[in-house]
Amino acid sequence: MLIDYKKVNIYQDERLILKDVDFQAEQGEFIYLIGRVGSGKSSLLKTIYGELDIDSEDAEKAVVLGEKMPDIKRSRIPALRRQMGIIFQDFQLLHDRSVAKNLKFVLQATGWNDRKKISRRIGEVLEQVGMTDKKDKMPSELSGGEQQRVVIARALLNMPKMILADEPTGNLDPETAANIVSILKDTCQTGTTVIMSTHNISLLDRFPGRVYRCKDGGLSQLNDKQDACDLDEEAALIEPIIEPAQDE
């Protein structure tokens, strides 16, 4: 099991965001986190990659990739994160470097120094996300969907055990959003776990996965027999998605 949370209380700025969280993730799973803005989705993800602390008195159990999160030292956080790929809604690419040089920068920063291996790995991840022909382009020359593909490629560079994607399709049109989720879903076939927060409830039917919902200060798992109207109700509660048209 990659993540095992039992009765975890999650705080942000001393304010209780989620209470008694039970959350588990196994290898190769695709997991959705849904809920309204401010419901705790991002806060939960932040505890997983060590951005938010978990105090020992606020958790019966909180283990991520073998690390007991209430006890983890800050010096261990970089090593933990190197086992993860983290994707945000805002792409955070280096705009003064080409696609290939963005990826090369990450590899060199994480200890890669063999030029041939670096070049080979960049080619592998760009092929995985369908961006081989864009390796020499600057980020400003790419559409929003293309930039997000590069971000996914960047997240895959070090062959992570899990990918945490916080609203990765939030600024994309529906077709491009579906393409991005399809790429993320495919990564699960190699054993990578993907945990994705989203407002876009329509993706759940098209790309099935386990679903957790943040609501009213708690986290609950929706099971396969959950009444369909429950998700329809959730969609009505969640703020409308603004999806500007972008050329892919």
Question: Which residue stretches match the model-derived regions?
Answer:
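Short coil-to-helix segment of the ABC ATPase nucleotide-binding domain corresponding to the Q-loop/switch region
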Residues: R97-F105
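Catalytic Walker B motif of ABC-type/P-loop ATPase nucleotide-binding domains
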Residues: I163-D166
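Conserved signature/switch motifs of ABC ATPase nucleotide-binding domains
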Residues: K137-S140, N158, T190
